[in-house]
Amino acid sequence: MPVADTSQLISGVAERYASSLFELALDAGSIEAVGADLTRIQALIDGSDDLKRLIVSPVFSADDQFKAISALVEKFGFSGLVGNFLKVVARNRRLFVLPGIIKAFRLLAARHKGEITADVTSAHALTLAQEIELKAALKGVTGKDVAVNVTVDPSILGGLIVKVGSRQIDTSLRTKLSTLKLALKEVG
């Protein structure tokens, strides 16, 4: 199966799971709480190589994944809805799409609130003050409330890459250095 087809398949699975979770959260009136739990889960995934391995590796059995996720749910006190959802995802051997589910849920929640979403890549985690300032700047440009999905990528060295819809603003140090390198090649 070509890579494009695989990513579309994963995206479709993630969107279906996210849609189901969103509908359950909407019925329970807990979209904000579920979103907060999903943000905590993403932070756990981003901060733990072992958890990343558990999620993506086909070596772990469904039972091993279920036990690990159940322990995680207990340890971090995820709500009943999110806890049960994670267990279902683990039992169905779909943990590998969990980051996609989280992203799709955020998009659904933002759309429900009339927000637009910006994907932001930063060399380091943003502080709460930086995130608030970024949201305010993006609201000034777009005229709408903006939810931000921050991804940390140390390889950009510094600055930000911001994607809002089809627009991208790249102020990363890596890009600036690449541009300077090209300019120097043209001069010499």
UniProtKB/Swiss-Prot annotation:
Annotated gene: atpH
This protein's name: ATP synthase subunit delta
Family of this protein: Belongs to the ATPase delta chain family.
Organism encoding this protein: Rhizobium meliloti (strain 1021) (Ensifer meliloti)
Name of one Pfam family that matches: OSCP
Localization terms from the record: Cell inner membrane
Function: F(1)F(0) ATP synthase produces ATP from ADP in the presence of a proton or sodium gradient. F-type ATPases consist of two structural domains, F(1) containing the extramembraneous catalytic core and F(0) containing the membrane proton channel, linked together by a central stalk and a peripheral stalk. During catalysis, ATP synthesis in the catalytic domain of F(1) is coupled via a rotary mechanism of the central stalk subunits to proton translocation. This protein is part of the stalk that links CF(0) to CF(1). It either transmits conformational changes from CF(0) to CF(1) or is implicated in proton conduction.
Subunit structure: F-type ATPases have 2 components, F(1) - the catalytic core - and F(0) - the membrane proton channel. F(1) has five subunits: alpha(3), beta(3), gamma(1), delta(1), epsilon(1). F(0) has three main subunits: a(1), b(2) and c(10-14). The alpha and beta chains form an alternating ring which encloses part of the gamma chain. F(1) is attached to F(0) by a central stalk formed by the gamma and epsilon chains, while a peripheral stalk is formed by the delta and b chains.
Membrane-topology annotation of the record: Peripheral membrane protein
